[in-house]
Amino acid sequence: MPTVPRRTLAAVGVAAAIGVSACGGTAPPPAAAPASGQGTWTWTDDRGKNISLPSRPQRVVAQSGAAAALWDFGVRPVAVFGPHRLKDGGRDPEVGEVDIAKVESIGNVWGEFNVEKYASLRPDLLVAGMYQKNTLWYVPEESVQAVDQIAPSAGVQLSGKPLVEIIERYGQLAAALGADPKAAPVVEAKNRFDAASAALRTLAAARPDLKVMVVTATPDNLYVAYLPDHPDIKYWGELGLNIVHPARPTESEGGFWEVVSWENADKYQADVILVDARTQSMKIEEMAGKPTWAKLPAVRAGQLYPWHAAERYSYLGYAKVMEELKTNLEQARDDVVK
């Protein structure tokens, strides 16, 4: 996932008030078992960092996306940081099905991490994803040293790896933290993910001419997703979806995207455009004011659908995403681009 515009959008998100409703659904898996009688707990994270504790961590603090993934696997963090509460008090989609009434908050927007409150929670472990190697997402650079002195951290690499491998990695960490990988909700979610993947593969095979593009935007630029850098989009391409994407990303912007000015927003065209649905992203209604964008075939045809760019890496999370995607693509025309 991108650092730019992800980082840019994170900053913009301070003022965002509109969000995508969080989904309800499957009963949650049982909480991870306590560590009574356990010996030394060890874990090697995706930085190659070896963590060794006297017993299994009980008090886990996690970035919202990591918390959401762990929650689906049965781990109950004591606190979260990163987007989790909307301005109206509702749950931000980025935190998945985490019960935000039952967890502490140590930061809700980019750059916000209350180190003093974090320390007061007596954490055993901090968990966060990493889009850039060795950089924990939403842990401010200026706070890293202080955070590291309070408790060890475990990073999960979210770029440069296949979608399923990232999901499995969160599952492995959850199991190490005491969650039951064979709990009925976890097994049901895996089956649902497999079924959604198969259904999307069938749709792709039946509609090879349906062209799909994925974008995000800021007031200054349109960002067209570069397929190889996004685990979810790459997975859909492997299932057979006809993804329109740049030949290479804009390297000066950190990869992940080709950055296109709004005047050149018609450089790539597709029958369907999936638009970043994060609360901090530029909204479709706002993008409508950009003349070149408004003339795109998919825009004129009304074939704009959400892309859940910050979906949690769990079977349940991506099962829901692919079910929604299949429903949207089924109703889309494949002759919009001539």
PLM feature segments, named:
Residues 115, 122-128, 265, 269-273:
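Proline-aspartate-enriched helix->loop->beta-strand connector
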Residues 149, 165-166, 264-338:
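Structured C-terminal subdomain patch of bacterial secreted/periplasmic proteins
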Residues 86-89, 132-142, 156-173, 209-235, ...:
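Extracytoplasmic ligand-binding site segments that recognize negatively charged/polar headgroups
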Residues 13-14, 18, 23-41:
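Short, low-complexity, disordered segments immediately C-terminal to signal peptides
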Residues 1-12:
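Bacterial N-terminal signal peptides that target proteins for export
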Residues 59-73, 181-245:
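Basic- and aromatic-lined ligand-binding clefts that recognize polyanionic substrates
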Residues 145-218, 311, 315-338:
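Extracytoplasmic substrate-binding proteins
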Residues 63-117, 121, 130-136:
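A short, structured surface patch at a secondary-structure boundary
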